[in-house]
Amino acid sequence: MELHEISKLDNKKHPERIVESKMKKRMKPYSLTSLNNLDDGCLMHILSFLSPIPDRYNTALVCHRWRYLACHPRLWLRVDRFVKDLSQPGVFLNIESAVSAARPGDTILIVAGGNYRVSNIQIKKPLCLVGGGEIPDETTLVCARGSDSALELLSTCKLANLTVKAELGCCLLHRSGRLTIDGCVLQCETNPLDHLSCPIVSTAGDEDIENILSHVEVKETVTGKIKANSVTVLQTRIEGGAKAVSTRGDLVLQRVRVMYSKAYLYFWFDVDYE
């Protein structure tokens, strides 16, 4: 029996295959075209229902328009201490409630104006915290006296355009993950016990990895991915404290650059494995 006759017999036995293949051919271009015909507001509303990682991240790879909409500030969570109408979705009075409600990959915009009280806020998922002012000084996080830190970071996180102030403690306590500090101001209040305070403290190291691997069996190739602890500081003012950064794990200070201005010092450096 010839091949084309065999295919005909197969199609007679399974006619649903023909229908399914035709539907796929019709649906794919049609569905994509229909989505592209939506206006920006409607498409952005649809994207807001997607989880930031990995769904919204994947949609940002489709085209320039989808990338613009998937990363638009309207999809960010917002912290506004002056807001009166809390019925608005994604708006919070304080940073702690915003961090608690955030999904992995979310960006939290902290509205400029006034001081936000923070104390030992743990961040256990990948987040980005951004100050809403023109300069970092317009958005200030103040750590209560007696607290260990303003923010305790246990996952990959980025802080941008923020001022963080602390007294008798540290501004940022880095436990694990990749921390990026971009264009911020870290200040430790000057006092007689200045040696007890430090803007950045990192305790990340091999102990964290060993604790994980002792409970979970993983391949050697995965170990390198788990070992992903680091701190990257970019164009950041650091003031007060015994020293800019204190490392109590296996990370060490590397690639330090300092730019002197009339009033401030701006730092670039990495805290990473040797």
Curated annotation (Swiss-Prot):
The keyword Transmembrane helix does not apply. The keyword Coiled coil does not apply. Part of a SCF (SKP1-cullin-F-box) protein ligase complex. Interacts with SKP1A/ASK1. One of its GO terms (biological process) is protein ubiquitination. Pathway: Protein modification; protein ubiquitination. Pfam families: F-box-like. SUPFAM superfamilies: F-box domain (SSF81383), Pectin lyase-like (SSF51126). This is F-box protein SKIP5. Keywords: Ubl conjugation pathway. InterPro entries: F-box-like_dom_sf (IPR036047), F-box_dom (IPR001810), Pectin_lyase_fold/virulence (IPR011050), SHCBP1-like (IPR045140). Residues 32-79 form the F-box domain. It comes from Arabidopsis thaliana.
